[in-house]
Amino acid sequence: MLEFSSEVSLLDSVKNILLEYGLRFQEPQIEKVDKYIEELLGVPYNLTAHRDLDSAVHKNVVEILLPLKEELKGTLLDVGSGNGVPGLILAIFFSKLKVVLLDSREKSVNFLRGVIEKLDLENVSVVKERAENFSKERREEFDYVTARAVARLNVLVEICTPALKTGGKLLFYKGPSYIEELKEAQRAMKELKVELEKVREYSLKTGERRALLILRKYESSPEKYPRRVGVPFKRPLL
């Protein structure tokens, strides 16, 4: 049986969860997260189950911020952004970032544009395009490229790295099976000229284990990558 309550505001609930993890924030940031979570859940907080709220904040905010130990600034591309995670959350908490949310699905793009307008985010834009096309057209443009729950690591390396500047970093959010993905991504990493810089493992108080994989691009990727639309997914580099 789910419990409902109107006694605690969404704003206070988000604050309390972030404080449990020792995450720092400013009031305007929490206000934007407040609006974002409400848009994500699709209903006012007083009609939302505690369980839904707790899950949304952990999955879409805490999971993104917890492993980051440094300030992010410059340009960031979020590939397969979907509901805006991680790119939208990073844009809220790192004001010096200029973020591009990339997705090929009309529904996702419309949702993201609506949220950006409601949150009045000036450092975020949305592009409707396939990652393979975008990375080929916008080579060496971004300081960071990030993704979560889009594809396995070898596919991500191919479709994301060309858009990354040499010396830039890939930030990939993964689950506990990342070690297996790293093993199968060795060819892709070699071909696309990236190396593993570090892995930050962490756990949520809800029980989930997560890892942030940070890869650095040490040389320009060959012009032949990424391959045409769909090929990296159908025939990944192994």
UniProtKB/Swiss-Prot annotation:
It holds the Pfam family GidB. Belongs to the methyltransferase superfamily. RNA methyltransferase RsmG family. It comes from Thermotoga maritima (strain ATCC 43589 / DSM 3109 / JCM 10099 / NBRC 100826 / MSB8). The keyword rRNA processing applies. CDD domains: AdoMet_MTases. One of its GO terms (cellular component) is cytosol. GO terms for molecular function: rRNA (guanine-N7-)-methyltransferase activity. S-adenosyl-L-methionine binds at G80, A131, E132, R148. This is Ribosomal RNA small subunit methyltransferase G. HAMAP family: 16SrRNA_methyltr_G. The lineage of its organism: Bacteria, Thermotogati, Thermotogota, Thermotogae, Thermotogales. Keywords: Cytoplasm, Methyltransferase, rRNA processing, S-adenosyl-L-methionine, Transferase. Specifically methylates the N7 position of a guanine in 16S rRNA. Its EC number is 2.1.1.-. It is found in: Cytoplasm.
